């Protein structure tokens, strides 16, 4: 594996996704020597297969706030490598959420899940929705709208959501 060549290709495909590209570079540089001792890895293009998401999608989340006003947020889900089982990963609701951050977190989730020895791939999802300052009813309506859209793309044999505290970090 030539890390620089692989990274150049990823940078071409994913311009401006600095968090994701940095995470991939760090992992590849860490495993490069061991990887190159196994020609079968290169023959099967394992590195290329693991660094690219299997699927990534964006969807609109429409919900109504307490004033009766329609709000529109963006929802995301990134799914990485389901070779050993369904995708598994959490949700993050924060204004800073973007495709690069979710690709970075989904890529890392592959390895976290592998370390548990459970047959699960990696995933991460979320939205640019900010729960801070929202009423419990607004958070509930947003979550209902989010899941109404997300459910079309996931299921028990495809993608299992994981609870994380990211969605509940209202108080700082």
Regions found by a protein language model. Give the residues of each.
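Single conserved hydrophobic/aromatic residue that forms the stacking wall/gate
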Residues: 163-172
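Generic start-of-chain signal for non-secretory N-termini
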Residues: 1-18
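N-terminal cap/recognition module
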Residues: 69-110
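Flexible, glycine/charged-enriched surface loops at secondary-structure junctions
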Residues: 20-21, 37-44, 117, 154-162
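Ordered core of a single globular domain
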Residues: 15-28
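Hydrophobic alpha-helical hairpins/lids featuring a short glycine-rich hinge
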Residues: 116-161
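Structured beta-strand/loop patches that form or line metal/cofactor-binding pockets in enzymes
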Residues: 40-67
């Amino acid at each position: 594996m030539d890390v620089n060549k692989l990274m150049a290709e990823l940078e071409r495909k994913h311009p401006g996704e600095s968090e994701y590209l940095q995470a991939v570079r760090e992992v590849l540089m860490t495993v490069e020597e061991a990887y190159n001792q196994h020609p079968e890895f290169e023959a099967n293009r394992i590195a290329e297969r693991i660094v690219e998401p299997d699927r990534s999608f964006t969807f609109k989340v429409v919900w109504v706030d307490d004033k009766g006003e329609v709000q529109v947020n963006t929802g995301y889900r990134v799914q990485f490598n389901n070779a050993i089982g369904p995708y598994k990963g959490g949700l993050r609701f924060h204004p800073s959420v973007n495709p690069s951050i979710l690709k970075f977190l989904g890529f890392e989730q592959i390895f976290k899940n592998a370390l548990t020895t459970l047959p699960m791939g990696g995933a991460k999802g979320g939205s640019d929705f900010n729960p801070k300052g929202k009423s419990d009813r607004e958070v509930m309506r947003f979550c209902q709208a989010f899941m109404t859209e997300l459910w079309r793309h996931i299921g028990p044999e495809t993608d299992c959501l994981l609870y994380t505290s990211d969605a509940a970090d209202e108080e700082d």
